[in-house]
Structure formats: C-alpha cells, structure tokens
A protein has these predicted regions:
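A short, N-terminal "cap"/entry segment at the start of jelly-roll beta-barrel domains
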Residues: 1-54, 158-185
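Double-stranded beta-helix
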Residues: 3, 115-185
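Conserved short histidine dyad/triad with adjacent acidic residue
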Residues: 38-45, 56-72
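Short histidine-centered beta-strand/loop micro-motifs
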Residues: 46-51, 68-73, 90, 97-99, ...
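Conserved metal-binding segment of the jelly-roll/cupin
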Residues: 62-65, 100-120, 131
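A short beta-strand-loop-beta hairpin characteristic of the jelly-roll/cupin
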Residues: 72, 76-102, 112
Length: 185
C-alpha cells in the first residue's frame, strides 16, 4: 500500500508545469501530479502514484492574481476547491465566469476553453480530477502560445515543454503552432 500513499507535504510540485508558466499572472503557481501523469507539460514533474486508476488526480496552488491561461482538454476536468477564493472563466473569449470557495466543485466539459485565477488574498489550493487513465492533451488559445514564445517557452508536437533560450528544437520534433480563429470558435 505504501506505493499508493501520497502525503501532501512529501509531494514535489512543478513551478513551471505549463507553457504559460513565465507569463505574468501564471508564474506564481505550483502544479502537483498525485495520481497519474495528468496533463502537465513539464516532462520532469514527479508523479507520486503512477499506477492506473481510471482517472488522474492533481492539485494546483497559486498566489493571489495567479492561475492558468485559457485552455481546453480532451477529457473532462473537475475542480474541488480546498482553500481560498477562485475565479473560473470559460468560453473562447473567457467572458463567462463564476467565483468558487472552499468546498465548491465545478465540472468542466471536454473541449471547452476554461481558465482559473486565485482572487483571494493568500496562497490557495484546489484539487483537480481528469477523467480516464489517459488524461489527453491541452489546447491553448492562440494568444497564450504567442506570448509564451516571447518568453522562450514553446510546446513540441509530443506536448512537452521546451525552453528555446536553452535548447533548440530537436530535429525529430516540431513546435505546436497556435490554433486558427476558426478552430477557436
């Protein structure tokens, strides 16, 4: 059973889990992969419980005014607020929104653009469940990929992060290009 135990104080978060991790409003955030690999684009992120469970469980902590950029998933995603106050917004333009607090839950359907931000006054935590053993991939709105590239961050066609300031794109890989406006809508 010890390989199925995750103590929060023993988890090792990624502080650069996604392509937008260097952008203002996204860089003071930690991502934890607790059960399964989740959708983190950081290939070095530690996965605490690696055996398949039929779902993936992770956690996100963020400082005030930090969270994720607009993105979609190919699997359902459920957020369980543990602490703090979070704004969730959705749609290709991100104009629909709600505020959630400790104990609240929201289930985001597949292929819908969504994002979240800590709107409280201290670091806050939530748990995230992704459906299925295969958590699928993330699709970012074009603006996020373009701004991330300006910081040197890009995504490769295997959905892994690359720091263009440190390394070149491997010959057997291509960078993911932003989706078109038609694909966004």
């Amino acid at each position: 059973m010890i390989d199925r135990l995750a103590k929060f104080n023993e988890l090792v978060p990624s502080s650069l889990p996604f392509v937008e991790g260097r952008l203002e409003g996204h860089k003071e955030r930690k991502n934890y992969t607790i059960i399964g690999r989740g959708v983190a684009e950081d290939t070095k992120q530690l996965i605490k419980i690696q055996s398949l469970h039929g779902y993936n469980l992770g956690a996100v902590s963020a400082m005030p005014k930090n969270g994720s950029g607009l993105h979609s998933h190919t699997t359902a995603e459920v957020f369980v607020i543990y602490s703090g106050k979070w704004r969730f917004y959705w749609g290709a333009d991100g104009k629909q929104e709600t505020i959630l607090e400790a104990g609240d839950i929201i289930s985001m359907p597949t292929n819908m653009f969504r994002a979240f931000e800590n709107v409280g006054d201290k670091e806050s935590l939530m748990f995230v469940v992704l459906g299925g053993d295969d958590p699928g991939i993330i699709t970012w709105v074009p603006e996020i990929l373009k701004k991330a590239k300006e910081t040197g961050m890009a995504l490769l066609d295997d959905n892994s992060l690359i720091d263009l300031k440190k390394v070149e794109v491997p010959k057997d890989r291509k960078m993911i290009e932003p989706i078109t406006q038609d694909e966004l809508e």
